[in-house]
Amino acid sequence: MAATMNKTPATTFLLIPAAASLVLLLAAAASVEASAFDYAGAFDKCLLFFEAQRSGKLPDDRLVRWRGDSALTDGFSQGVDLVGGYYDSGDHVKFGLPMAYAVTMLSWGVVEFEKEMVDGNKLHRVLDAIRWGTNYFVKAHTQHNALWVQVGDGDSDHLCWERAEDMSTPRTAFKIDINNPGSEVAGETAAALAAAAKAFKPYDRMYSDLLLLHSKQLFTFADTFRGKYDDSLQSAKKFYPSASGYQDELLWAAAWLYEATGDEQYLRYVSQNAEAFGGTGWAVTEFSWDNKYAGLQVLLSKVLFEQGGSAAGYADTLKQYQAKAEFFLCACLQKNNGHNVKMTPGGLMYVSDWSNMQYVSSSAFLLTVYADYLAESRGTLRCPDGEVKPAEILLFARSQVDYVLGKNPKGMSYMVGYGSYYPTHVHHRGASIPSIYAMNATVGCMEGFDKYYNSKNADPNVLHGALVGGPDANDAYDDDRCNYQHAEPTLAGNAPMSGVFARLAASPADNTPEYTPAPNAPSPSNGGSPLEFVHTVTNTWKANGVDYYRHVVTAKNTCGHAITYLKLQIKELSGEIYGVSRTNAKDMYEFPSWMTRLDAGAQLTIVYIQGGPAAKIAVVEYKTA
């Protein structure tokens, strides 16, 4: 479940798990170093998660075989067919707002990376995932000014731990209408249907037109009868409260309708309401199911990139949207004059103590698409702390994905089923209870808590592709299904990863040319170095007959000036390293992505684990303020 977003400070120093965890860290780090991440495989698993979350009558050709049909009478008692759609997370409520956001993000991935998905033979599966959501939205939109936006109640649902196939909790449905408006969820559903319409247009024109019809009607409903959805729907407020209000969703829906139709009335809407609705005023450091401003600003920047001078009459406003988009991007890249997204010591963006990975995935998506926009226009991102090339933006986005897949201080994949070391006690009812095909007897409401929720056994069903909430602000993770803030996956967290995986899977392999120092650069030696290195071994152990060491290197700035650029040569390194960022040149490293300067007297901490002798570290090049 989602909650309000709390900010948590981070530090630039690396923290390593206790000695008891070091062998696991070593094994995982070695596998990370030995081979590149399989983004295509991760993409495949990401789509499996959406299959596992399906509600309703499941198709015979489904790939997730441990799931069965469920909730086959949703809405019937209230005279409407609401069978289908997706369960939100580890429970069985169908929350309309995050579900619609997830479909929007899946569709945006297709819009941007259709070719990559076709080349990787994944497009049909992504479109199937989108259609499972849009079919439900079309059914839920029963009148022009009415939309069913929730099935199930979070409070009663959470009192039971049972499989979807055994559900005994009330399946009450809730709707918004002219007397009980909900502009956020109506606007987001309009955005989802418009984005999906564009994704389907080349392949199913009639279906695309149907989605557009519903999208336009829902946008008009959201805009004409304005009101916060969680004022009308108290049962959603506890779980998905609207902190940002509904104005971002109105702009977001209009932007997607313009993207899908090219109809100028929607571009006029986002231009005329830009200031009043906060589109050109909000400078944010998060993008989520609640706050759409960063996504809106990036999407409208695309219009400027594509149309340039032909967007006459709107160009000035679009440039204001773009300025706010670039504020967000520079904040992610740690180049925003101190107004940056917080980072964990291991290099993960950290926005919230609750389900932080959803912000990582959405930010990685925006960084990835914007990098491509810039590359196609031969532009660069100009941040307060320096210019950033498209390839560097993509590299940072990839660093976040790599962290997710295992390049992190715990050496753990936070995507279930990816790699050999991943969460096995996920906060998810279906994953934690044996499948109905393995154990046909009904699991009762409280029986599920006694036998499975509190069990120390690993999940009997692997929830392939689920992106859990992730580690805390210090890169620590407790693999415990009671730890719902960190161990629960969500639709909103997974959806943006689809497009990012498609893009990264299609990228060419990295080249690692030999580094050639600049003509006046210092030679690779410690003579005259601006840094004083202190190298210590803080732990040692034996694994598989090999002695391993945990090395900690502190590099103190002794030159008397702030260092704004640093290039290190690290030779004879065989293990994973933390605290510096690898460059494309062999054996060359620079400041970590979350660090832009090292003040006089300050220390940079580098940690690595390997067998045999210590690595050799030397300063190759540096600049001072």
From Swiss-Prot:
The active site is at residues 91, 427, 479, 488. Its main location: secreted. Keywords: Carbohydrate metabolism, Cellulose degradation, Glycoprotein, Glycosidase, Hydrolase, Polysaccharide degradation, Secreted, Signal. GO terms for biological process: cellulose catabolic process. It comes from Oryza sativa subsp. indica. InterPro entries: 6-hairpin_glycosidase_sf (IPR008928), 6hp_glycosidase-like_sf (IPR012341), CBM_49 (IPR019028), Glyco_hydro_9 (IPR001701), Glyco_hydro_9_Asp/Glu_AS (IPR033126), Glyco_hydro_9_His_AS (IPR018221). GO terms for molecular function: carbohydrate binding; cellulase activity. It comes from the Eukaryota. Residues 509-530 are annotated as: Disordered. SUPFAM superfamilies: Six-hairpin glycosidases. Glycans are attached at residue 440. It is found in: Secreted. GO terms for cellular component: extracellular region. It is an enzyme of class 3 (hydrolase). This is Endoglucanase 13. It catalyses: Endohydrolysis of (1->4)-beta-D-glucosidic linkages in cellulose, lichenin and cereal beta-D-glucans. Belongs to the glycosyl hydrolase 9 (cellulase E) family. Its EC number is 3.2.1.4. Residues 1-34 form the signal peptide.
